[in-house]
Each structure stands twice: as C-alpha cells, then as structure tokens.
A protein has these predicted regions:
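Bacterial N-terminal signal peptides that target proteins for export
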Residues: 2-12
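Charge-biased, low-complexity intrinsically disordered regions
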Residues: 5, 67-72, 76-97, 102, ...
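C-terminal motif of bacterial Sec signal peptides marking the signal peptidase cleavage site
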Residues: 20-24
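Extracytoplasmic
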Residues: 35-40, 46-48, 54-59, 107-111, ...
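Post-signal-peptide N-terminal segment of Sec-exported extracytoplasmic proteins
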Residues: 45, 51-75
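Short, non-transmembrane alpha-helical segments in secretory-pathway proteins
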Residues: 84, 88, 94-96, 166-198
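Exposed beta-strand-loop-beta-strand "reactive/processing" segments of non-cytosolic proteins
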Residues: 117, 125-130, 135, 185-232, ...
Length: 240
C-alpha cells in the first residue's frame, strides 16, 4: 500500500512538472526577450524620416523625426504596404524635389545616412546593403553625387549600453567614416589629430580634426544620428 502511494505521488509530481514546463513553452516571451517582428530604418539627409517595416520588408509607417522630415512625409501619403527599397527611392526623389540636395557641405553634396535601429528584424541577410544599393540607384538616377553611409548593429559603441538596452551612440570609427565620406577623403590619406566625444549644449557630438593631402579639416558628427553637424576645411597653402 505504501509503495502504491509513493508511486502515485511520484507520478503526480511528474505530471505537475510537465504541465508547468509545457505552459512555460506556450507562454509568450517577456518583453526583454521577445523577438522583434518589425524593424526601423531611419533616413537622414536634412530631413530625418523613420521607416517602419515588417518581416517581409513592407513599410507599415513613416514618421518625420524633425520638421523637414515631417514635411516630406506629409507630401508622400501612399507608402503603406510598399517594399522598403521602393519607399526609400521615392523619399530620395521627394527630398531632392524639396531642394535639400542643393546646398553643399564643405564643398561636397550632403551624405545620406541609413541607420538601422538595434534589434530590428531583417527580411534578408543583406537587407541594409540592399537598401544602400537602392538608395544609390536613386541618387544616380537624379544625377546626384551624395555619399551613402550605413549604420547597423555593429556600429554602436557597446561601452554605453546599460540596463539591457543597446547603446544610443555610434562608435568613433563610424563617426570618422562619416566625416571622411562627407569630405570625399580616402581613409588611407587621412590622419586624425584630435578626436573627442562631447555633449555640446546637451547634444552628443564627435569633434574630429584631421589632415589629408596637406588640407586641414574640422568636422562635428552627431553621435546618435550620424549627421554632419559642422564641416570646414583649410586648403594647403592658404592663410588662417
């Protein structure tokens, strides 16, 4: 009789444990561990536009992150369900028609920054590269010469990650790449004499000074968006 009771107790405990295990498998993951089913790609020229897309790469929402971006989004209402690369091309056309590529930065056309939010779903392994290629096609089609810079998960400085959240700041190396692209300078030709990370009036900025081919450059890069905030250079042989 005692043996039967022990056997029954053991079987009951096993059943309870199995039920708990199965319930855990069927329960939704906690917010911190759930896999994202959407992604966010931000396009920055002067307008900053946040593009939200689903696992299939279809656009679900557009949001202007500054006043210029809001104006572009208002002028482009027909985007829901379109492929992300097609929306990017359309936005480049809209931005060009609005005159944002007219002004140069330090003698060169403005960079186009494509920034992928950390943890975003990737419809394909080459998603960001494909978006960059589509943007480049749009740029060439408009006879523009803007450089294109991409920012993905590997380009955020892990030293500033905390509380399980990714760092909001790009790395110094990415800031240097952005500066060189805007200046139209090859990395092999550049020597960085000064590089500081500072909060200028509350804005996180990389302050960079470098020389290339005898010219002296001073560039400020926004540490969150990757936008060029300041850009100037002194040509070799000219006076200060």
């Amino acid at each position: 009789m005692k043996l039967r009771r022990k056997l029954f107790a053991a079987v009951s405990s096993l059943a309870v444990a199995s039920a708990v295990l199965l319930a855990g498998c069927g329960a939704p993951a906690q917010d911190g561990t759930a896999l994202k089913e959407t992604g966010t790609l931000t396009l920055s020229v002067n307008p900053e536009i946040q593009i939200e897309y689903n696992r299939d790469g279809k656009v679900t929402a557009l949001t202007g992150r500054n006043d210029d971006g809001k104006g572009i989004v208002e002028a482009y209402p027909d985007y829901i369900g379109k492929d992300c690369e097609d929306v990017l091309k359309d936005l480049i056309v809209e931005i060009n028609e609005a005159g944002y590529f007219v002004d140069d930065i330090d003698g060169n056309k403005k960079n186009i920054v494509l920034q992928l939010e950390p943890g975003s779903v990737l419809p394909s392994d080459d998603f960001l590269a494909d978006m960059s290629a589509s943007t480049q096609d749009a740029v060439k089609g408009l006879n523009l010469s803007s450089g294109i810079v991409t920012i993905d998960d590997d380009d955020y400085d892990s030293a500033y990650a905390k509380d399980g959240k990714p760092s909001p700041y790009i790395t110094l190396e990415k800031a240097q790449e952005i500066a060189l692209t805007q200046a139209n300078v090859e990395a092999a030709d550049a020597v960085f004499d000064d590089k500081e990370f500072d909060h200028d009036d509350g804005t996180p900025i990389f302050e960079l000074e470098f020389t290339a081919n005898g010219n002296e450059y001073e560039y400020d890069i926004h540490a969150v968006t990757g936008k060029v905030v300041k850009a100037e250079h002194k040509t070799a042989g000219t006076q200060s």
